[in-house]
Amino acid sequence: MIHIEKIPNGSLQENCYIIADGTDALIIDPGSDAERIIDTIHKLNVIPQAILLTHTHHDHIGAVDQVRDAFSIPVYVHELEQDWLNDPEMNLSAQFTTIPVTARPAEFEFTLYQEYHFGKLHFTVVPTPGHSFGSVSFIFNDFVIAGDALFKGSVGRPDLPTGNLDQLLTAIKTELFSLPPETVVYPGHGDETTIAQEQKNNPYFN
């Protein structure tokens, strides 16, 4: 049985997710509040295997190094945004925060459309660019972690560096709307939704 723990964190209420099956766990987008994320891992009594990044804007990476070091686990990222981890201009912390956000390079870069296995957990990485050009989503059996691509009733901002609205909408229609309609969508901000709900109600597609 997969357990999904959502930890809204930071001033932008970015959703960090802990995905667990038994004692195997993955940490997705640890944006800030490292101590809270680490405490939650201990309370769940799980063993994290890796940190996965949907993209590398500052609100999704601020706790990467603290969490990585606490559990001695690797970080995975799209190759196009590997350099952004240590670049406050590209991860936008130079523009939007008082203290620049940086992290060490990720240990691994995703191979798109590959299925990854971490203990009992397995998922496929698909490209969902448009909010940023290295944005990805993680497709599990009956849910998807969509980062800042698709939100409940909206989509990610396309007006940031390397963003593109047409590319974003095409990626959502191609990679996410092709999933079963009952698939639950866990976004980078806000509440979860379903593919069917967004196909029916999202103003960007209606």
Regions found by a protein language model. Give the residues of each.
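Conserved N-terminal entry element of GNAT/NAT acetyltransferase domains
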Residues: 1-3, 118-122
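Conserved beta-strand hairpin/beta-sheet module of binuclear metal-dependent hydrolase folds
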Residues: 1-44, 137-147
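Short Gly/Pro-enriched turn/cap motifs at secondary-structure boundaries
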Residues: 7-8, 107, 127-129
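Glycine-centered loop/turn positions within well-structured domains
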Residues: 14, 25, 82-83, 134, ...
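Conserved S/T- and glycine-rich ATP-binding loop of Class I adenylate-forming
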Residues: 19, 54, 128
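Residue-level marker for buried hydrophobic side chains located in beta-strands
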Residues: 26-28, 52, 75, 145, ...
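Active-site HxH/HxHxD metal-binding segment of metal-dependent hydrolases
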Residues: 33-117, 203-204
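Metallo-beta-lactamase
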Residues: 91-94, 122-206
